[in-house]
UniProtKB/Swiss-Prot annotation:
<keyword id="KW-0460">Magnesium</keyword>
<dbReference type="InterPro" id="IPR007081">
    <property type="entry name" value="RNA_pol_Rpb1_5"/>
</dbReference>
<dbReference type="InterPro" id="IPR007080">
    <property type="entry name" value="RNA_pol_Rpb1_1"/>
</dbReference>
<dbReference type="GO" id="GO:0003899">
    <property type="term" value="F:DNA-directed RNA polymerase activity"/>
</dbReference>
<dbReference type="InterPro" id="IPR038120">
    <property type="entry name" value="Rpb1_funnel_sf"/>
</dbReference>
<dbReference type="InterPro" id="IPR044893">
    <property type="entry name" value="RNA_pol_Rpb1_clamp_domain"/>
</dbReference>
<dbReference type="InterPro" id="IPR007066">
    <property type="entry name" value="RNA_pol_Rpb1_3"/>
</dbReference>
<feature type="binding site">
    <location>
        <position position="460"/>
    </location>
    <ligand>
        <name>Mg(2+)</name>
    </ligand>
</feature>
<keyword id="KW-0240">DNA-directed RNA polymerase</keyword>
<feature type="binding site">
    <location>
        <position position="85"/>
    </location>
    <ligand>
        <name>Zn(2+) 1</name>
    </ligand>
</feature>
<feature type="binding site">
    <location>
        <position position="464"/>
    </location>
    <ligand>
        <name>Mg(2+)</name>
    </ligand>
</feature>
<keyword id="KW-0479">Metal-binding</keyword>
<comment type="function">
    <text>DNA-dependent RNA polymerase catalyzes the transcription of DNA into RNA using the four ribonucleoside triphosphates as substrates.</text>
</comment>
<dbReference type="InterPro" id="IPR000722">
    <property type="entry name" value="RNA_pol_asu"/>
</dbReference>
<feature type="binding site">
    <location>
        <position position="895"/>
    </location>
    <ligand>
        <name>Zn(2+) 2</name>
    </ligand>
</feature>
<dbReference type="GO" id="GO:0003677">
    <property type="term" value="F:DNA binding"/>
</dbReference>
<comment type="similarity">
    <text>Belongs to the RNA polymerase beta' chain family.</text>
</comment>
Amino acid sequence: MKDLLKFLKQQSKTEEFNGIKIGLASPDLIRSWSFGEVKKPETINYRTFKPEREGLFCARIFGPVKDYECLCGKYKRLKHRGVICEKCGVEVTQTKVRRERMGHIDLASPVAHIWFLKSLPSRIGLMLDMTLRDIERVLYFESFVVIEPGMTSLERGQMLTEENYLDALEEYGDEFEAKMGAEAVLELLRAIELEKEIEMMREELPSINSETRRKKITKRLKLVEAFFQSGNKPEWMILKVLPVLPPDLRPLVPLDGGRFATSDLNDLYRRVINRNNRLKRLLDLAAPDIIVRNEKRMLQESVDALLDNGRRGRAITGSNKRPLKSLADMIKGKQGRFRQNLLGKRVDYSGRSVITVGPTLRLHQCGLPKKMALELFKPFIYGKLEGRGLATTIKAAKKMVEREVPEVWDVLDDVIREHPVMLNRAPTLHRLGIQAFEPVLIEGKAIQLHPLVCAAYNADFDGDQMAVHVPLTLEAQLEARSLMMSTNNILSPANGEPVITPSQDVVLGLYYTSRECVNGKGEGMVFESVDEVEKAYRTKFAAIHARVKVRITETNIDENGERSESRRIVDTTVGRALLSRILPKGLSYDLVNQNMGKKQISKLLNTCYRQLGLKDTVIFADQLMYAGFHYATVSGASVGINDMVIPDEKYTLVADAEAEVLEIQEQFQSGLVTAGERYNKVIDIWASANEKVSKAMMENLSSETVINREGVPEKQESFNSIYMMADSGARGSAAQIRQLAGMRGLMAKPDGSIIETPIVANFREGLNVSQYFISTHGARKGLADTALKTANSGYLTRRLVDVAQDLVVIEDDCGTFEGLTMKPLIEGGDVVEPLRERVLGRVVAIDVMYPGTEKVLAPRNTLLDEAWCDLLEEHSVDEMIVRSVISCDTDFGVCKACYGRDLARGHIINQGEAIGVVAAQSIGEPGTQLTMRTFHIGGAASRASAENNVQVKNAGTVKLHNAKHVTNSEGKLVIVSRSSEIAIIDELGREKERYKVPYGTILEKLEEASVAAGEIIANWDPHTHPIISEVAGSIKFVDMLDGVTMTRQTDELTGLSSIVVMEVGQRPTAGKEMRPAIRLVGADGNDLMIPGTEVPAQYFLPANAIVNQDDNAPINVGDALARIPQESSKTRDITGGLPRVADLFEARKPKEPAILAEYSGTISFGKETKGKRRLVITPADGSEAYEEMIPKWRNLNVFEGEKVERGEVIADGAEAAHDILRLRGIHKVANYIVNEVQDVYRLQGVKINDKHIEVIIRQMLRKCEITNAGDSQFLAGEQAEVSRVKIANRELEAQGKQPATFERELLGITKASLATESFISAASFQETTRVLTEAAVGGKSDKLRGLKENVIVGRLIPAGTGYSYHQKRNAAAAAGTTTEAAPAISASEAEQNLADLLNLAGSSD
């Protein structure tokens, strides 16, 4: 018995390891793995089904087919363990060795490994410094290569064709040696002396001038160094021995009907073996060279196909015309080893079923069908039945459960009590997609789900299915209860707001209850307590909406948790008084004394959580839900066609709009406006008509006039069901009501352009055929979009998770003084995000002072909670520096202080929290809600009429930001720069509003002027882009020839003529090279200069520009020389929604990026070329000037002689993130990406905390480029991990040596994932072949730092509850001891268990 135990213990002993190293295998190593050579291509004997000897399934090489039984049957049973049968040569052992024992094939001729040959850049090619084509010609026997030139004029590695070779033979005889095939490459590789090569290249590098050559040598140097340091030998890239996979990993399975299903690998191996054997025979026979050569080539091709089928030439196909799955295909892709089996596995003890509503459940419960529970908890039930003596053996218990005897149900109740189960709904987009509940047994076959958790699961009850999983061990149950219980996940990790807020019916019920109505039954009564109100309501003395006075009792909790009661009389309604009964003690009555819409309810829950904590909130949420359902039922809110009230004004408004459109049409026909302008104006007219109709409709819907108690008519909010649903936030929106009762309005075509005839009808009136047809456009596009969106969103989430998966909180405080500067976000006249929302839950990096004093308001390292934020707001702080993960100094992780508050828990984050994954999920999860396209409301085009002025909302003073302006003849300012902004500053100097104003805007106020609220301070024409004159003079036309570069159009009505510049494509040949322009000359006929510069005032005219001035006409400063009609609403395709987010995270360069100044200095223009101008920046310190060529069609924002700062915009366009990082630094680029991503989400009304985006940006910035290596091991121009460089620099500084300098680099998320230190993580993400090839050549070792690597090797992850395990391991490793993975039970216990098992096995037979 003891031996058996020892033996079992030996089997279960695990090896401890701290990393995984990958390298090239030498032929000897492959032979040492092998248990024998596979010599025959046969698999199994088709009659006996026994494996053939020396074949691909040979039992002698790979082990026995049956447990503890040799092939011929001479030795059976455990007692012969380890014996090798003398008859058939099979070792008696377990069958599972067939999963681990490898064989080998001795190749008759060496073969190149295709990965190192074809995976770019070709490693063999780089090593030999030959091109891939040349090497392939040698390998596939098309030409010779010189190996040993001897005393001849040939060079080593020179290619020779067949003829050249024969000529050389005649000339030199056997002085030299040249070969073809893999042997030749093998000898070349073997001859390389790595150390010498490294020395040579290192000496050569500094003296090289050509950039390309230097790049090439650096690349080769890196490769050679990698080989040298890893101990790999170059010749191992050529295979002499081929390993054979264990047979159970490429199984051969008999199907019924005597046929076999086999893995494709067996076919590929058989090909290799056949060709190899044939080649051996040919070599023995000394066959003619050409035949041997052909056979060697075929062998090379068959090994290629085995390793990576389809990498070179056509893929080898099987009998079903499908390419065979090679070894490389087994590990890559979604169905490959990594993603199918290692990162996600199927689990036992799970079931799935349809879900239905469980409105009677508590928040921590779910309804589990009895049938499912019985199946899921079977082992527990067996155990209990035996323990209670109801069943003698497991078999008896099994029979009882199958018969479903009554005792079984009692036992099931006991087993289930307080045993949480996990519910999961696919797709699991964030961590709230799996939550734990306590099961409640129910009849029926559907799982019941609590309505409040639907939002987190994104579940509805139209046939959704959910899966149930049972945590088995005590630890698993504990984790499920403490971490995953639905009651512990009240706040969303994405934004820290309650995620269990009521929706739909519940909201409608609560809203209905809390509404007030004029002259309701019982209005004006006074009650002494809430109980009395309830009495009056139940006895029908008071209607639920009646306004009454009630004395209420409130519980106040002060800072120390002391409770005190206070009473007061409030004006309220019956319904609100009833709601206050479920309000937890300690909350103010004012929270329910209002119309309870969705927002108010969410705020109420949030306040409850912050003031009273988790338990009260959970109970309260349930109570709210029950109340909501109850009152929604009682209210009888329903929808009838009469509820959609069409306003009477609609018809006059529509008629007015039609008249306006006709007028525009006439103007167009008489040539006053261009087609584009007409289109734009028409669309504007209809957009504003639509707005007016919907406004009239909402006013009509939202209020009604009733007679009050005094008999006087009084206006009150309407009780129209549709209006109540939209107003409360239960269902529907103003836009949808507009389509029901207003007019459907403008529709978009699938390409996003707007159809100019709107749908005047609404759904109540009904659509005619043409209107219906126009509608289908947008609707169909919407459906197609949704399908695409889901896939794209999932892929974005996957990339995000992959880049951020190894980011974990690993220390308390890194002590950095850096951080991000936070200001309120202002767009137009609104504060989009006040400062408090941006800094809530962050840590202060540098003391915040009372504004205007030296007194500290919030000291460094304060965690800003709600109270602190109130304080900051009180003292109107509008700028401060907070800690951020981007500037955190921790290596391989972040610290608690830089992250701040854990949004889902409401206190500072814990160590071991996997913030990377949480961030990725928070950004990815709402991805499915983001639109793919810029417009869409059921296909209706949402486009406000174009803005043409700035109207101020607050009084204050005007301030201009990077605006250049000239003063026109009327004394008004005209803006002549492009990215200008106007800000309004209040008396405290805080910015209240900020507006972007286009080129050509006319300002009504000067800078520093004070304005009143509602004043219009700027005007411009939204449909044309003017060209403004900056000097006064007279016009000279340049290259303006009628019929060559421009056409004249005369208006019949007015007789005015205008000039239109022709497009290049439409000009005759003579005009192709001409560049039409307007030059300004003075009275003396000489060129005028642009003010303050040496540049002549000459304005180039783009195609389609309209000039209303004549040659030699006088012109004033600030007048328009020409106007360029702006194209229709689709001007610049603004990438909206999801693609925009993906572009930002991938750090893609925009098509026409803005050009930024590379240095600070003075601008001048050098010699022009045909299509470009030369921009020169001369730095102020007199160092070398910087030159850049800029295409002429780019609009420049700068003039000659102007001073620019580094990073300022020179030519407009979308800014590229890389440029911002290079020229303005890390904080600016972080701000840019955060704001741009937030813009997209804000548009959809999704709230995400900035922290999450910053976490991803930190990962995008984790690489840097070495600019100067100093005394370090790095090479200049090498890409390295920032944390590595920092660690190396610390060591160098400690020794007094010179540290390396580096520049941060911004990588897109895909690139950053592939550039991670861990090759396992990168290989399981994308481009598996390339990653593994690179890692093997460099002999990389994976330290298993991230989450993915640990999941793949089957360990606890170094985050969450597995964090402490890894901490202990790391501590032990640092101390130099290896921790032995101890078995969980002692030997004596194991012995007892085993004895019991054996008894059982014996007795139940």
